Amino acid sequence: MVLVFTHPDCALHVTPPGHPERVERLAAVERGLAGIPVERRECPFGDEADVLRCHPVRYLARVKGAVPSEGWAQLDGDTFLSPGSYQAAMRAVGGICAAVDAVVTGEAKTAFVAGRPPGHHAERETAMGFCLFGTVAIGAKRALDHHWLARVAIVDFVVHHGIGTQVLLWDEGRCLFVSSHQMPLYPGSGRPEERGAHGQIVNVPLRAGSGGRAMREVYEGVVFPALAAWEPELLLISAGFDAHADDPLAGLEWQAEDYRWLTDRLCDFAGGRVVSSLEGGYDLEALAASVAVHVGVLEERGR
C-alpha cells in the first residue's frame, strides 16, 4: 500500500485571483486519489533543522518575516506569500521528511506527498516560480544526512526545469539529479552541459510539441541507464503533471497514460523504494487524471 501525506494547512497558501498555483489543485488531487486504496497520514509540521540542510538561516528568517498579516506579499514576479503560506510550506517539508523516514525504515515501499506550495524552483536564498523551500532536495538531504544512505536519486519530470533542486544539490556528490523538461521555457536553465560539481546532474531537454514517444526515447536512452549506473538506495520524484497536453503553462503533449508508464518504470529502481512529491500541474482535470494513474502505480508497486 502507498502512504499518502496531506494536511489541511496546505490549503492556507492562498494565491491572488487568476494565479495558476491555486488551492483548487488540492481538490483535483483528491479526485485523482478517489478509489485508490491508500494509507493516509497527516504531514507533520516541518523541522527547521531540515530546511537548514538546504537553505541558510537568514533566508528562513526572511521568508517568515515577509509573511503578511492579510492579503499578499510578492517575493518575485509570480511567487506570493499569504498569511498561511509559511505554515503550508512547512507542512510540505514535514510531509516529505516523514515520507522519506517511512520508506527508508521499511515501513512502506512507496509514498506520495500532496503538499503545496511546490518546491523545485526555490534556490538557496531565492523564492521563485511559485516555490519557497526546496522540498524534494530537503528530502534527499534528510535521507543522506539523517539516515546515512550512500546514494539517492531524484527524477524531476516537471515541464519546467528544476533549477532550485539543481542549485541546492550542485555540490552534493551522493545525489543523482535527473530532469526532463521542455526547452526553451522558464526558467531557462537545464542544458545538457549543466552537469554538477561531480557530474551527477543529468538534464534532458525536450522540444515543445513532443509527446509520449519522445519521452520514452529519452528515458530509455538516457535516464534509465543513468539510474541503473547510480544504483540509488532511494528514489525521489518531483512529480509535476504540467507536461500534460492540456496544461496551460507549457507545450509538451504527454497524456495520463504516459505518466502511468513512466511511474511504473521508475519503480524498477532503488529496490522499488520511491517517494513522490507533488510539484506542478495546472489544468485541474489533467491533474486529477495524472495523479490517479501515478498514485495508482505507486499503490500497485508498494504492495
State where each predicted segment sits.
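HDAC/HDAC-like amidohydrolase catalytic core signature
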Residues: 1-155, 159-303
